[in-house]
Amino acid sequence: MAFLKLTEQNVQGKTVLIRADMNVPFKDGKISDDTRIRASIASVKYCVDNGASVIVMTHLGRPTEGEFHPEDDVAPVAAHLGSLLGKDVKVLNDWRENKPALNAGDVVMLQNVRINKGEKKNDLELGKAYASLCDVFVNDAFGTAHRAQASTEAVAQAAPVACAGVLMAGELDALGKALKQPARPMVAIVAGSKVSTKLTILESLADKVDQLIVGGGIANTFLLAEGKAIGKSLAEHDLVEESKKIMAKMAAKGGSVPLPTDVVVAKAFAADAEAVVKDIADVAEDDMILDIGPKSAAALADLLKAADTVVWNGPVGVFEFDQFAGGTKALAEAIAQSKAFSIAGGGDTLAAIAKFGVTEQIGYISTGGGAFLEFLEGKELPAVAALEKRGA
């Protein structure tokens, strides 16, 4: 991927417009998790430290375009950013009527981009209005890269210079390393409740990986495709044929979709359900498969330890309940111990990484959510394509 990077730009004396993703959650009117704000600080600091003035823009929540309500106000986000930077960060509500006059080192924030008419439709005139504020546009919002919107795509077309911020460049470099030129053997874990939501990812990765580990409800559908009984476990009977095709595709290239030989079952999906380990052949009609068994976990852990690239999306069991967390824990620890370059993404995956204390041992943790999944699917990300066009 060829794109310009913020860290390669001379920003001294310039005004830099940074599209960040500071869409943070609130509880009782206060920010409950500032991870996204902290993740965006590197680009802001780079600009300030190198003599630029900075305008930050972000979305917050899902406001109605053209309407402004108190809960849509980015003022608490600006205040929190200011406290982390040790600066006063003002919110600009009338930036279209009054272009801000800024000095080097100043940091300001535009009001919530999603209240601007034309934002979601990628309106070119709105993109030009954003671009008119700056000498350099920086996209640092990988989490919105799969959407073509005025603050991510149109502005990149219109700005004098358009480049990737520290966070965006890190994401793209890591994803490129994992998917474009992976060191082999390459192993992917794709898990979740439904094949239907991950089918395009499974099909795309089956073309790239040497081993494709599936887990959760997805694995149950693959077990059905192998003719195994899964009791009353979650599965999609209408996708059994698709699952067979993916297994055949992997087998044809000398790879495999290694399925569990033992599982952890319960009679009910509940925090206090009794967990029982069974061979797959012994699963009863009223059993629910809620995790992989210890033998399967050990076999998959060996695959991961021998890998040179690992892509991880989704836990292999109901790890929120400790009695069904063993499989996901074993795989997390195997990835942590592996020499492989590992990249992980998706909300449940990040929660599992945090729970099992392996954050520092994962090569790269993607903040992307939907953008991460679409990259895995092999789809073009509009905001990234816009940066590549400008970097050519």
Curated annotation (Swiss-Prot):
Task: Name the pathway it acts in.
Answer: Carbohydrate degradation; glycolysis; pyruvate from D-glyceraldehyde 3-phosphate: step 2/5
Q: Where does substrate bind?
A: D21, M22, N23, R36, H59, L60, G61, R62, R114, R147
Q: Subcellular location, in the record's words?
A: Cytoplasm
The reply on keyword Nucleotide-binding is yes
GO cellular component terms, alphabetically, are: cytosol
Positions in coiled-coil regions: none
Against SUPFAM superfamilies, the record matches this protein to: Phosphoglycerate kinase
Q: What is its EC number?
A: 2.7.2.3
Keyword Kinase listed? The answer is yes
Q: Which UniProt keywords apply?
A: ATP-binding, Cytoplasm, Glycolysis, Kinase, Nucleotide-binding, Transferase
Q: Which InterPro entries match?
A: Phosphoglycerate_kinase, Phosphoglycerate_kinase_CS, Phosphoglycerate_kinase_N, Phosphoglycerate_kinase_sf
> Which transformation does this protein catalyse, written as a reaction?
(2R)-3-phosphoglycerate + ATP = (2R)-3-phospho-glyceroyl phosphate + ADP
Subunit description: Monomer.
Per the record, the similarity remark reads: Belongs to the phosphoglycerate kinase family.
Name of the featured protein: Phosphoglycerate kinase
- Organism in which the protein naturally occurs: Neisseria meningitidis serogroup A / serotype 4A (strain DSM 15465 / Z2491)
The encoding gene: pgk
